[in-house]
Amino acid sequence: MRKEYVMGNGAIALGALAAGLNLVAGYPGTPSSEILETVAKYPHDGVHVEWSVNEKAAMEVAASASYSGARTLVTMKQVGLNVASDPLMSLAYVGIKGGMVIVSADDPGPISSQTEQDTRMFADFCRIPVFDPSTPEEAYQMIQDAFDYSEKYKTPVLFRPTTRVCHAYASIEVKDEWKAKEYEGFVKDSKKWVIFPRLSFANHAMIEKRNVEIGDDFGSYSMNTVEGSGSKAVFASGISYCYAKETLKNVPDVKLVRIATPHPFPEQFVKNALDGVTEVMCLEELSPYIENQILRLAGKYHMDIDVRGKQTGDVPASGELSTNKAADILCDFLDLKKTSQVDVSDAPELPVRPPVLCAGCPHRASFYAVKKAMAGRKSYFCGDIGCYTLGNAMPLDMVDTCLCMGAGITMAQGFHWVDEDGVCFAFVGDSTFFASGMTGVVNAVYNDANMILCVLDNSTTAMTGHQPHPGTGRNMMGQFVDKVSIQKVLEGIGVKKIVTVDPLDLEASVAAVKECADIRGVKAIIFKSPCIAITKPSGKMDISEKCIQCKKCIREIGCPAIILKDGKVAIDESLCTGCGLCAQICPVGAIGGACNE
């Protein structure tokens, strides 16, 4: 064994390798991205690593490998589980052979997600087990246990770290070396692996019986613990358990119960923990899952227990908890004097720093070109998930809607059908196009919609950490592969008008938008320019004495590198990348520098 200082996601990855991992597939999404990347950093024989085109594809790749007896890991953030839910629901009925663990990282807050959905609820819905680690150390061990339970009960298993567990750091003991599992291979059996209604009917009954067995098994699982004693009990899971433990470390006469396996609920374990208890506080983030389970249990066994939590208003219904929030909740519950907290009344307020597109980001130029071309015309601007969602910020104000990955393309079609006078735009990044955009384009062509697809191609998956995708020409196994051409895909689908333009050429970009806006049908503009974070900046721009202080550059493009200094427009050289967009909009040609050299 050796010590490694790793973040929670790294601990999950190393734990999976220690469990004999054979294959990992996933799709990047905060807070889960580093899991798969960590596996890729430790090259060894017998493990296939891939960023799949989306979460559904990742789930299906892993499923067939599991059918062959291999141990497989699937990684995603919680909203990715929605995308993967179709195969996952069926997998719960069909079952697996080799251990299969699906990491679905929840995001209380949310900090970087569309929703505050709870993977524990999804596990209940799918009727499969879920593990809920509290720390990176626990995550390292629990992911290994999850593989064992998966193989023992022939079921996929969910693993649910939250953002604070994923991104926490800890020094943990890990194995010196790993060995991938040796597996039998796929054994053909159509009565087992081909899903039919009759098989689903029989397996549904088996699943319910199996879950009772798993719940009983979880009752003796080492991570489900009871500490202390008393008539009052605090039930917690995940990071909330750490907050509770911190508050209660010197508090006598209270039980602290950790539920590390929320589903199937360890009923007998909890029933025993409730012996002698009259009041319960359920400390948990997102849904009142544990609270509901204890209420169900109290009703089933006619227990006279006061159960408190989210549904009684004691715990916030939304947002993440913290040590201070948990302390306040538990002090109220236990009638304790609230713990003293650091006085920050005299501390200066943190500066407001709203998220913005980077200085030199080509997406800013793409949005500005469309805005300039459509000035005075009724338009709809449908956004998508990625850095370019920040196009909604002032002064660009170029994202009217954002729902989920790929939705911008199909939502633009909906706007067309209810308002044929408007010009309907869909903005989608190159990675999102491959993940969930192509079917939307097929739908547009098939139904003869009138819309303009703007593919913001910056040659990476920027927002989640610059992961490769099918258009980059490389994969996570370190191989150079053929690039999938977005233009050829669009041509194959049947898009008749396709224009590729450098968004940093403002005149050409505006002309392309105007041309497409006057043509009926499905049109596509590929705004192609690399992400400024992965390319060498051109240099710095400068502002000459010709500047008339009209501030058009500040009012219209919102680049963070253009600032006011002593009341005058200036360039922040620490941020400027020399993209030259500002020089192209200056009415008096006062901005020069890198782009003109």
Task: Please provide the spans of the model-predicted regions.
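Flexible, low-complexity linker and terminal segments
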Residues: 1-9, 133-357, 362-363, 503, ...
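Short acidic, glycine/serine/threonine-rich loops at helix termini
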Residues: 35-38, 61-63, 84-88, 110-117, ...
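Short beta-alpha connecting loops at secondary-structure transitions
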Residues: 46-47, 105-110, 126-131, 278, ...
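Conserved thiamine diphosphate
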Residues: 107-156, 162, 198, 345, ...
